[in-house]
């Protein structure tokens, strides 16, 4: 389903953003 693909993209982007925030906090 298209919405599942979009959901995966959003989750992947959110995970990437969260990871960037965590790395920034640790640095």
Swiss-Prot record:
Cell compartments where the protein resides: Secreted
Keywords: Amphibian defense peptide, Antibiotic, Antimicrobial, Cytolysis, Fungicide, Hemolysis, Pharmaceutical, Secreted
Expression by tissue: Expressed by the skin glands.
GO cellular component: extracellular region
A GO biological-process term: defense response to bacterium
Family statement drawn from the similarity comment of this UniProt entry: Belongs to the frog skin active peptide (FSAP) family. Dermaseptin subfamily.
Subunit: Monomer and oligomer. Forms aggregates in aqueous environments.
Stated role: Potent antimicrobial peptide with activity against bacteria and protozoa. Also has activity against fungi. Also shows activity against enveloped herpes simplex virus type 1. Probably acts by disturbing membrane functions with its amphipathic structure. Binds to healthy erythrocytes (this binding is receptor independent), and has strong hemolytic activity. Does not bind to P.falciparum infected erythrocytes, but accumulates within the parasite. Kills the parasite, and only at high concentrations has a hemolytic activity on the host cell. In vitro, shows high spermicidal activities.
Protein name: Dermaseptin-S4
């Amino acid at each position: 389903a298209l919405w599942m693909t979009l959901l995966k993209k959003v989750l992947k982007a959110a995970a990437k953003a969260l990871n960037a925030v965590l790395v920034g906090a640790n640095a």
